[in-house]
Design a protein with these regions (language model features):
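Glycine-rich, small/hydroxylated-residue low-complexity segments
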Residues: 22-475
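Sec/Tat signal peptide C-region and signal peptidase I cleavage site
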Residues: 17-21
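Bacterial N-terminal signal peptides that target proteins for export
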Residues: 1-7
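Bacterial N-terminal signal peptides
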Residues: 7-15
């Protein structure tokens, strides 16, 4: 509520034009109050975190960034500058936004100091902001020569992109909430990391497109979300999962406190082109790699949907027989999970964080959660193009516990006979040829395709009516 009241006061002040020196103190004070409410007590603001100088019909805005912004966090860089112009309806126009071309952030953590250095060679950004959230607000930025370097406990990492384009919009939704959407594109993205445990890891993509959304976000909870993220971010080092400090547990607990506010719906989809990955003992190339996640809880129960797709895999010597892009042409998988109550899941995660995952009661509580709330697992889409063959599948499974699982699926394939013939001459397929022949024997013809109707219940696995229970591992 404090953020909304500050924003309304800010909109009223900004509605006055032209820019006058006499108005600067009141406007700066309003901006100070708005930022203080948004960032919380963890960020110590200066007396003038935003400085305004009137110039004709707009303000020249300067935002100093050097200084402490939280417990153990220190920023060093040139000020952010922009022109600020009042628009109709209390909106702002922010033009000629310029971020620090060189920005350094250091964070003191229990494992040691982490340092991030951001470099921007070229930039062009502008925004339209409605502090009252009554109309659509937006941000658009174009950056060239993007580079982000991290060094800290466990290693160092350098990420670069020739061009980065970003767009962010938030607009009013029902019941005083807002919908947030974001898109981004990078060209010639590369990441090179040297980690103490993994050695050298290199990744590159000729082009990356990303899109994300948060639905029906409650504005009053935005400050808590930002403050929780600020507290947790510097503690998430590569070794954090192995050495989870009490500070990190507390910060992640605060994130969980506000996570329920995101369950109206949020998600992200990323698509990469011409991807290369090198790690110790592995070199992979893909023409396309896509992945995504969508989470919501429309009826108080979590609905999770994942997506993964890949075209033209070339694994070189890393995969059996040297799997090439002409063999694994396409893979796509879209699984979903529904049924677990959001409140109980968040409470269980809170308890696991509080005890570092070592509470002996946690397994029993997790089992009770599954027993009381049947978990539905499904695959909406599965497709695999392997040489001349194409496999597709869909299915559903109900989980009441580790020993109470039932489900059904339908697998369909075309070109499997040609694939079996090719397996005689291709080393990459020779190792799986017995499996292909076995599957073909279980299948039933369906025109030019082969189908497998699969069912599992009461410990019995059947494929097209044939009981294969003896092949299922038993306790």
């Amino acid at each position: 509520m404090r953020v909304r009241l500050c924003a309304l006061g800010l909109a009223t002040l900004l509605g006055a034009a032209p820019a006058r020196a006499a108005d600067a103190p009141a406007l700066e004070a309003a901006l100070h109050g708005w930022l203080a409410a948004l960032l919380g007590p963890g960020v110590a603001l200066s007396d003038r975190p935003v400085q305004l100088v009137p110039q004709d019909n707009h303000w020249a805005m300067t935002v100093p960034v050097t200084g402490g912004i939280g417990d153990g966090l220190l920023l060093l860089g040139a000020p952010v500058t922009a022109t600020l112009r009042a628009m109709d309806g209390g909106r702002w126009a922010l033009d000629a936004i310029r971020l620090p071309p060189d920005l350094r952030l250091s964070a003191a953590t229990p494992q040691g100091e982490s340092v991030w250095t951001l470099t921007l060679r070229d930039q062009d950004a502008h925004a339209v902001i409605d502090p009252a959230l009554a109309t659509t607000s937006s941000w658009d930025g174009r950056f060239g020569g993007y580079a982000l370097h991290w060094q800290g406990p466990g290693g160092e990492r350098q990420t670069e992109a020739v061009h980065v384009v970003s767009h962010l919009a938030w607009q009013p939704a029902a019941a005083g909430r807002i919908d947030v959407t974001a898109t981004g594109r990078s060209e010639l993205l590369t990441t090179n990391a040297r980690m103490d445990r993994q050695g050298l890891v290199s990744f590159s993509a000729a082009r990356t497109d990303a899109a994300g959304h948060i639905d029906a976000l409650l504005p009053a909870r935005v400050p808590a979300l930002i403050q929780a993220a600020l507290a947790a971010a510097p503690l998430l080092t590569p070794d954090a999962s192995r050495h989870m400090s009490p500070e990190l547990r507390g910060a992640l607990g605060a994130v969980l406190d506000v996570a329920g506010d995101l369950l109206a719906g949020f998600g992200e989809q990323v698509t990469m082109r011409d991807v290369h990955l090198h790690t110790r003992g592995m070199d992979l190339a893909m023409r396309m790699l896509a992945f995504g996640v969508n989470v919501s809880a429309p009826d108080g129960r979590i609905a999770l949907k994942l997506h993964f797709a890949m075209d033209g895999l070339d694994g070189g010597a890393a995969l059996p027989g040297g799997v090439g892009g002409d063999l694994v042409r396409h893979i796509a998988l879209t699984p979903r999970l529904t049924g677990l109550p959001a409140g109980r899941v968040l409470a269980l995660l809170h308890e696991a964080l509080a005890h570092g995952g070592e509470d002996p009661a946690l397994p029993a509580e997790a089992a009770a959660l599954m027993r009381d709330n049947p978990l539905a697992v499904g695959v909406d889409d599965f497709s695999l193009e392997l040489g001349p063959a194409r496999f597709t599948a869909a299915g559903d499974m109900q989980v009441l516990g580790a020993d109470q699982v039932s489900g059904q699926a339908r697998l369909r394939a075309t070109g499997i006979d040609a694939l079996i013939r090719d397996a005689r001459d291709q080393p990459a397929l020779g190792q799986v040829m017995p499996l292909l022949v076995f599957l073909k024997g279980l299948g039933e013809p369906d025109g030019d395709a082969t189908v497998w109707n699969i069912a599992y219940t009461g410990g019995h696995l059947t494929v097209n009516g044939t009981d294969l229970s003896q092949m299922v591992p038993q306790k």
